[in-house]
Amino acid sequence: MQISPLLENLMEALRALPGVGPKSAQRMAYHLLQRNRSGGINLSKALNEAMTHIGHCRSCRTFTEEDECNICKNPRRQMSGQLCVVEMPEDIQAIEQTGQFSGRYFVLMGHLSPLDGIGPREIGLDLLQSRLENESFHEVILATNPTIEGDATANYIAEMCRIHNVKVTRIAHGIPVGGSLEMVDGTTLSHSFAGRRDVSL
């Protein structure tokens, strides 16, 4: 059956989203056209505005429509002396929701992966080096993912920080709150034992 070229284009465009295959794209397209045209128009406007105006913060590399994001511009954040290194911009949002960190960030946009041709420069470590040289940090917190690549990236950055005499810490990894030991994998359990701490009463 021959369908509208515009509908075909819409379905193909929706497939740019992660996890959306042909069937999902078809369902979304028909839903927007049949039941939610105003939502589709709003989506189109928001997508166009975001793609046109959102860039990267010159300091931390997160997404922002300004030259520098609100976190980097915040004087209170600047005074904290802490820098948290994360892999992706969405990691910042996850950390901010905890309310436990009041410093600034640096976004790698990935992790070291020599087999894929991703070296230090590809994840902005030259820019991080510049920040360590030109700004005053008393602690760098490494919040990369607990994967082989994340660990390798954290170790590389830790060495950079030591050269600049900056304290380096890594966020703890272990058993999730409410989790059961029998359901936890061996690697996570090993991290939990390695990161154990004293019980204060």
From Swiss-Prot:
GO terms for biological process: DNA recombination; DNA repair. PROSITE patterns: RECR, TOPRIM. GO terms for molecular function: DNA binding; zinc ion binding. A zinc finger (C4-type) spans 57-72. SMART domains: TOPRIM. The keyword Metal-binding applies. Gene3D superfamilies: 3.40.1360.10, 6.10.250.240, RecR Domain 1. Residues 81-176 form the Toprim domain. Keywords: DNA damage, DNA recombination, DNA repair, Metal-binding, Zinc, Zinc-finger. Belongs to the RecR family. HAMAP family: RecR. NCBIfam families: recR. May play a role in DNA repair. It seems to be involved in an RecBC-independent recombinational process of DNA repair. It may act with RecF and RecO. This is Recombination protein RecR.
